[in-house]
């Protein structure tokens, strides 16, 4: 009990610190400039590229990647296990994950179950732990996504991927444990069929869903978590109890990237498909006005907020809060992003200026794993690993 009390105290102290830091230098700063091309202390390095051959049987598609990344996946899976065992020292939870979870969850749709089995066999990690690693992203993703349209009608779609809140804090170097362990697992993926690109994405090795990607010439898509009382935990419980009529959000995102052929088709699927967890889908197209944030409950859409440059709406910004509500006072990334966009102006939109915005604290924070930049029309896709050196807010 003492260990849990100390953990609670640390989390409360972190929350108070972040609440104070959200609106005070040096944890916030004026809009950054000249950070692109990426360099300096906020740049960890490039994200490596791998090809996923969709012509291969699902079981074999990830083998080459996982031979490279398997050792790093074992590190993060062991960190998850250690955190669980801290709360349940008997080890029974992880025993259930290893022995019971695959049967509890039953079959997954499409190729995903066979892909996870292949990953488990190559890495020699129990299938239950690979499944739990994939489930994890349904519950703990915090991000900032932006779509912009310039005066010529050209669209850009960018995002910071923030992940790992409350999942272990390293007091020696002031970093989130899981966030840091995800960086070596971050990969750019070129999904190909008949040796031609179907879509590109940035993801984590071992995860078969998608959170960030684009279909060249057609549309771009990012997924942000949406917190709700009717949330992912309830959807997961329903799935375990046998109600399997909803889609995993990472899987539906991948399915849309792989199979949808237009912005409108993608928007229709994302707006209407029943989901296991609430979410924000940030979708960009290839022509003027094609950009929106789809705010989803599990069963239906609450709101579709679209670009409307004729009415002065030349950007959309989505973090992890409904646009009609104020962000949580200790986690306001929306206001700094909007402020920097307005200062940038519609005339000066580019990968460089948008990377500057995503490099400005607290949009950039201790949870930020990578920054992705997407230009659908020009088939230009970039992703970079990030750091946020002290002083930097925890989220």
Curated annotation (Swiss-Prot):
EC number: 3.5.1.23
Catalytic activity: an N-acylsphing-4-enine + H2O = sphing-4-enine + a fatty acid; N-dodecanoylsphing-4-enine + H2O = dodecanoate + sphing-4-enine; N-tetradecanoylsphing-4-enine + H2O = tetradecanoate + sphing-4-enine; N-hexadecanoylsphing-4-enine + H2O = sphing-4-enine + hexadecanoate
Top-level taxon in the UniProt lineage: Eukaryota
Pathway the protein acts in: Lipid metabolism; sphingolipid metabolism
Claim: Signal is one of the keywords in the record: yes
Enzyme class per UniProt: hydrolase
Pfam families cross-referenced by the UniProt entry: CBAH, NAAA-beta
One GO cellular component term noted in the UniProt record for this chain: extracellular region
Residues the UniProt record annotates as site (Important for catalytic activity): 162, 320, 333
Cysteine-cysteine disulfides: 31-340, 388-392
CDD domains linked: Ntn_AC_NAAA (cd01903)
Keywords: Disulfide bond, Glycoprotein, Hydrolase, Lipid metabolism, Lysosome, Secreted, Signal, Sphingolipid metabolism, Zymogen
Residue ranges that the Swiss-Prot or TrEMBL entry lists as coiled coil: none
GO terms classed as biological process: fatty acid metabolic process; sphingolipid metabolic process
UniProt modification remark: N-glycosylated. Proteolytically cleaved into two chains alpha and beta that remain associated via a disulfide bond. Cleavage gives rise to a conformation change that activates the enzyme. The same catalytic Cys residue mediates the autoproteolytic cleavage and subsequent hydrolysis of lipid substrates. The beta chain may undergo an additional C-terminal processing.
Family as reported in the entry's similarity comment: Belongs to the acid ceramidase family.
PANTHER family per record: ACID AMIDASE, ACID CERAMIDASE
Name used for this protein in its record: Acid ceramidase
Gene label: ASAH1
